[in-house]
């Protein structure tokens, strides 16, 4: 008898020889579909899914992605000493609009492009020996350099190498606000490059903070590419018209489930892409890994255990009040560090062999208190 592929719940089964058998994929119905209003559910099934969703409502613990850095005021007072190592002008917005219109008019199911990739005139090589360090009152040291990409809402940095010695931490910081996010490369550095987390602003500082006694000289890296983010998908959805209903206006049982619906940012050869995803209940109550379900076309081309290296996940981007102003996608809590691609299958989701679904496991915990959404293998009724 075939055993369920536990990391993927019950929607995929292992074949007789241990391989995943896509032809035996069971359609998974999850809460994000319901929030989209695409299905009519009988009351008994609604109660079942709602109850399963609430199983994941416990706080699971994580630090906020953005934080005010305690040494920011000291660094800001010496802003003139932070060198601008890369300064790129604003891209031609008319060209971007034309490209986006062509993408979005295609019949093929696709993702929303929110950013472009920009090559640098030359790779910027840096090391602890070449950076200018400032000692703080507590005996620690900071060093920084600045990158500008004209009219960017935010950026991500692409590195071919980033060596962080013990006691040294890198931060991606909005130069105008001091809001920072940790930039922690994986132990196994991906090829051909690794993308750091996104940060709001058209001028971003890469800041290094070294504890007293840390071997600063061992720090090194190579910045080779910039992801220039020029669209906010949440703001655009708000402006799209009455066809987009504010989820914060929904009544129970949906209101308690909104926090389990997230955004997903990824990078491929065409630029920075945005999709939605769902944080779902795990059947493994011992491990309780943070699992995310999304469409396969959102992450296609990223396969294997470490194939979802550049993904980041955005949470709590819903409006705080019915028809209120949405927050910027670049300022909400997020989960960085990539994810593991557990299983997936292509297809249109409407016809053919595949149902266009992918299961991911986050490498870092999402913020505390998010609802883990229920799911069922029951077929939904037509409607």
Q: Which ranges hold each PLM region?
A:
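Extended extracellular/luminal ectodomain segments enriched in beta-structured repeat modules
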Residues: 149-156
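Solvent-exposed strand-to-loop "edge" motifs in beta-rich extracellular domains
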Residues: 160-162
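Serine endopeptidase catalytic core focused on the charge-relay Asp
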Residues: 198-383
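Bacterial N-terminal signal peptides
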Residues: 28-37
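Protease-domain processing segments flanking chymotrypsin-fold serine proteases, especially trypsin-like
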Residues: 41-146, 189-198, 202-282, 286
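Short, surface-exposed beta-strand/strand-loop-strand elements in extracellular ectodomains
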Residues: 164-178
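N-terminal secretory signal peptides that target proteins for export/translocation
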Residues: 1-24
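Solvent-exposed serine/threonine-rich low-complexity stretches and specific carbohydrate-binding patches
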Residues: 180-189
